[in-house]
Amino acid sequence: MSLHGPYESDNIFAKILRGEMPCVKVFEDNNILSFMDVFPQSEGHTLVIPKAPSRNFLETNPKDIGRLFGSVQRISKAVDLALKPDGIRIAQFNGAPAGQTVFHTHVHIIPCYEGKSLGTHGGGMADMDELNALATKIKEQLEA
């Protein structure tokens, strides 16, 4: 898909927001939802999305951008405390040529560990029990 075009309400994140698809939730408020990536590049790979519909960063309301990145910082700190990675990659893609695969604005929080290579984007599906355990650890730090 190109960088520009109409928002498609049948994307997986829109379905998650409507409750039509499940997710392993990490955080939610009136404007933001965060959940575990089911095709993680590393242990603890978390996604953060605005609830308002937008295809990409360029089309997202500036107020939602502020809320989104405030939440990304807060959740990244919780990931750091919960999982003790050696680094954290914050990634955001716009348009298919840039690597965007779901056309709803989202940010990846990808913990990085010394000596462990990142998996490929969309590689293997994670074990749901493991994702739930990771989400619980992150949520505990958010609530601390």
Regions found by a protein language model. Give the residues of each.
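HIT superfamily nucleotide-processing domains
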Residues: 1-144
